[in-house]
């Protein structure tokens, strides 16, 4: 400990210069606690307020589907090219190296399979475990217009409440009821309900008509799901249109890991999301990287 006689008076106090408090500019997040903003700043690049997530949580209801048979062989080489990893805690602990040093969005809903009703989910992760795993957000499905709509909304409310206690963001993932049309009206409804409940991020689907309304009507960031595997040019066009119409990023799985050149695909998506490249330029980048 320094002696009292050795303490020197400070001189440069910047008197007359107001203290700098840079605003947290991510959509709808300016009033959140410091810890939650810090986690969101790891998910969304503060320079662009956008993100490229790599989703490989499909096994929680699909099992070892194509491309996810061996996470350590097929997916691990992609980690460094994604901004964020989205997975289950089982895969995180068993396969993902801590040294990968990538933010994680942790799948926190489950208890179903493709053999039953997909909408009948429960909260599958305690918030304390998400904190223990150093996750940057938890994610759960919300199924508007299904038999289990009420339970799915209760699930995200539970995660949101617990997340507020621990500074952990919640990403609500909009599912689709069997009798619901995948259109702007449905996804606007589902996204807005989840945001109104307090979700800090919404993951939803891109639609060809009216997506800009979905994005504009949602008060928090929207990231789009990649959905089923598309030809690379089509997937990049979808990505470009979503970003151009107000999405804050993408959370792609099958359109990455089922591609013949997944690293090239990730680089092309990154160029659209963070460098504002159009789909044609991104596809040329994909072809170049593929070769």
UniProtKB/Swiss-Prot annotation:
GO molecular function: acyltransferase activity, transferring groups other than amino-acyl groups; fructose-bisphosphate aldolase activity
Superkingdom, natural source: Bacteria
Residues in coiled coil: none
Keyword Plastid: no
GO cellular component, as recorded: cytoplasm
Protein family: Belongs to the DeoC/FbaB aldolase family.
Protein name (record): 3-hydroxy-5-phosphonooxypentane-2,4-dione thiolase
């Amino acid at each position: 400990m320094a002696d009292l006689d050795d303490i020197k008076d400070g001189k440069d106090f910047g008197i007359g210069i107001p203290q700098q408090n840079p605003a947290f500019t991510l959509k709808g997040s300016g009033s959140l606690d410091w810890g939650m903003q810090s986690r969101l700043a790891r998910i969304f690049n503060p320079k662009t307020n956008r993100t490229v997530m790599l989703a490989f949580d499909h096994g929680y209801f699909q099992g070892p589907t194509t491309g996810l048979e061996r996470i350590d062989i097929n997916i691990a080489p992609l980690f460094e090219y994604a901004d964020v990893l989205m997975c289950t805690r089982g895969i995180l602990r068993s396969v993902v190296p801590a040294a990968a040093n990538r933010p994680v969005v942790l799948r926190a809903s489950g208890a179903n399979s493709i053999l039953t009703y997909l909408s009948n989910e429960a909260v599958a992760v305690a918030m304390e475990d998400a904190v223990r795993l150093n996750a940057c957000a938890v994610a759960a499905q919300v199924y508007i217009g299904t038999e289990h709509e009420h339970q799915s909304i209760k699930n995200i409310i539970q995660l949101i409440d617990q997340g507020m206690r621990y500074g952990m963001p919640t990403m609500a993932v909009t599912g689709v009821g069997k009798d619901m049309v995948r259109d702007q009206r449905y996804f606007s409804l589902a996204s807005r309900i989840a945001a109104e409940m307090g979700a800090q991020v919404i993951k939803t689907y891109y639609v060809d008509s009216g997506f800009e309304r979905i994005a504009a009507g949602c008060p928090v960031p929207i990231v789009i799901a990649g959905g089923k595997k598309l030809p690379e040019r089509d997937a990049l066009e979808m990505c470009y249109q979503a970003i151009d119409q107000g999405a804050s990023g993408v959370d792609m799985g099958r359109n990455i890991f089922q591609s013949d050149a997944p690293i090239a695909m990730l680089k092309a998506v990154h160029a659209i999301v963070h460098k504002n490249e159009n789909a044609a330029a991104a596809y040329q980048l994909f072809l170049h990287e593929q070769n």
